Amino acid sequence: MNATVHEIGHVGHSHLRTLWTEERSQPEMKHKILDNINSEGICTYIGFTAQHFAPAPDDKDYPMIDDPDRVRQAFKNSNLILSKVGQIPDEDIQKMSWDLGIQGRSYYVVGLTMCKLIDERLGRNTLIEVMSTGPRKWVRTYNQLADIDLQLSI
């Protein structure tokens, strides 16, 4: 049931994309990565907050946010991928993105951590506002709240 909640979140996130007011990041590959972290992040956060009615005892991502080393590594992986944009071929970035971001769960853990911090510190309305504006606004808002070693580069 919790996985269904996550996947339904993707439907809502697809609608949010139509409302984004910020210009797309350049280069395009950077925008795709930020969009992916944003999408997986909010959908993972939706599932995380739904555990009271849709338990997820076997979820891989939720326990990781309680492990500072795993969270730090997820941010390092995501920042590494972002740092390679424009330096290596897009096909290689897509492979890194798949291996580290998706299979390695970095995008899920980073995005969940970001949504959780914004929601806890600034409130649900602010989280909704920045999610409705676009991924760069979301990252900038999060980075203002986060420790330096847990910030996402844009």
Language model: regions and residue ranges:
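Glutamate identity and glutamate-enriched acidic tracts
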Residues: 7, 22-23, 28, 40, ...
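Soluble non-cytosolic domains of exported or imported proteins
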Residues: 3, 33, 37, 105-109
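Short alpha-helix carrying the canonical HExxH Zn2+-binding catalytic motif
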Residues: 1-13
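Extracytoplasmic/secreted envelope proteins and their assembly/folding machinery
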Residues: 5, 40-47, 112, 128
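Pan-zinc metallopeptidase signature
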Residues: 60-154
